[in-house]
Amino acid sequence: MIFVTSQPAHAVAKVGEMLEELVVEFQIDPANILVLTGHTALRDRIRAESPGGFACAAWEDRHDGDIVCETIHRMKGLERDAVIVVTADDDLGDHLLYVGMSRAVSRLVVVGPRALTTRLQAGGPGI
């Protein structure tokens, strides 16, 4: 599990850095990577900005090789080899975080503000 502290304005850029690391360093097929967030506005920003040059698509619009970027609510019950859970604030509830984090089979990255990553590293309540 990797925790990446990010200020809200830099969350999408941090996702790009982590995508590059997962694809290049860990050699994970982009089609086996899922980017999840609790907020539709952040999901839409990630899709629009193609962080790190990686195309991120909606579940229903994905093509071979696309990274899926969705809200945690939409992906409940589905898994991928690698998952990046990203938020620009620390108000995601423990249950929602757990659902997002539990989608990862082998690699999990959490990108968020210091308060969130610190709480998770300490084994925050309910996590």
Regions found by a protein language model. Give the residues of each.
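Core RecA-like ATPase module of SF1/SF2 helicases and allied nucleic-acid translocases
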Residues: 1-127
